[in-house]
Amino acid sequence: MSKNLYMEKIGKKSKLASLNLSNLNINKKNSVLKKFNQYLKINEKLILSANKKDVSNAQTKKISDSMIDRLKLNSKKIVQIRNSIDKIIKFKDPTGKTLSAWKRPNGLIIKKVSIPIGVIGVIYESRPNVTSDVSALCFKSGNV
């Protein structure tokens, strides 16, 4: 499968997922984020093992030492990631808020309301904590 076809396939699936996610209430979103956090705790050894493979592959590909250092995970970093998710869980729901409202001379009331964007793409390198932070923030705001 070509890269373009692969990206198109991911894009279509992401758009479909965004439509489903945009309808979740804050309690369900927080419940899913709590389960994600528990998953990280329960599967820490598996995650660290997979990270060692990532680091080894990066070393084989002669990736810079500074980038490899950023790629490395340990138990302390897993705790930091989990703490970050806990903070995101405590954020208020950013969707459905009236940002401004006004009444037109003809009586029509117009409201500017926050809604999910839908699909968000993020480009970054070599930082596993960014993956979890971006995922949790996007999920909390109803985006994928």
Predicted segments, located by residue:
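N-terminal Rossmann-like NAD(P)+-binding subdomain of aldehyde/semialdehyde dehydrogenases
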Residues: 1-110, 137
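Substrate-binding/gating loop at the entrance of the active-site cleft, primarily
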Residues: 101-144
